[in-house]
């Protein structure tokens, strides 16, 4: 069994990695991937804490978060495809400059 502190440190590291990647990248696709990393790291923290307390609530919440992440990524990818077809770019700075 993985100790609680190791699991939470890993979840914090993954969340921090996703946040830094979200802030640094200008491409919408990479930003979407960074959001998925952050969501999955929060789910990992719930599973680790649930396992520590011998409760299945963390795993149930993981299934809920996994469903939420799948719907978020499918909607995000659909919007990303439409954005690329319309503006021919995925750079967030260039998209914010285009008005109209």
Swiss-Prot record:
Primary localization class, coarse: membrane
Its membrane topology: Multi-pass membrane protein
Chain ranges passing through the membrane: 4-24, 28-48, 60-80
Pfam families from the UniProt entry: Oxidored_q2 (PF00420)
Gene Ontology MF term list: NADH:ubiquinone reductase (non-electrogenic) activity; quinone binding
Keywords: Cell membrane, Membrane, NAD, Quinone, Translocase, Transmembrane, Transmembrane helix, Transport, Ubiquinone
Keyword Translocase annotated: yes
Coiled-coil segments: none
InterPro entries reported in the protein's UniProt record: NADH_UbQ_OxRdtase_chain4L/K, NUOK/Mnh_C1-like
Localization, UniProt: Cell membrane
EC numbers, comma separated: 7.1.1.-
GO cellular component, as recorded: NADH dehydrogenase complex; plasma membrane
Keyword DNA repair belongs to the record: no
Biological process according to GO: ATP synthesis coupled electron transport
PANTHER family: NADH-UBIQUINONE OXIDOREDUCTASE CHAIN 4L (PTHR11434:SF16), NADH-UBIQUINONE OXIDOREDUCTASE SUBUNIT ND4L (PTHR11434)
Family: Belongs to the complex I subunit 4L family.
NCBIfam families: PRK05715.1-1, PRK05715.1-2
Record note on quaternary structure: NDH-1 is composed of 13 different subunits. Subunits NuoA, H, J, K, L, M, N constitute the membrane sector of the complex.
Function of the protein: NDH-1 shuttles electrons from NADH, via FMN and iron-sulfur (Fe-S) centers, to quinones in the respiratory chain. The immediate electron acceptor for the enzyme in this species is believed to be ubiquinone. Couples the redox reaction to proton translocation (for every two electrons transferred, four hydrogen ions are translocated across the cytoplasmic membrane), and thus conserves the redox energy in a proton gradient.
Name by which UniProt lists this protein: NADH-quinone oxidoreductase subunit K
Source species: Buchnera aphidicola subsp. Baizongia pistaciae (strain Bp)
Gene: nuoK
């Amino acid at each position: 069994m993985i100790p609680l502190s190791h699991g939470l440190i890993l979840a914090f590291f993954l969340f921090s990695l996703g946040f830094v990647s979200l802030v640094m990248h200008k491409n919408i696709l990479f930003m979407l991937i960074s959001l998925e990393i952050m969501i999955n790291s929060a789910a990992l923290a719930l599973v680790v804490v649930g396992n520590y307390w011998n409760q299945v609530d963390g795993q149930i919440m993981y299934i809920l978060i996994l469903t939420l992440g799948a719907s978020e990524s499918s909607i995000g990818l659909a919007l990303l495809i439409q954005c690329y077809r319309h503006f021919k770019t995925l750079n967030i700075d260039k998209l914010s400059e285009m008005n109209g």
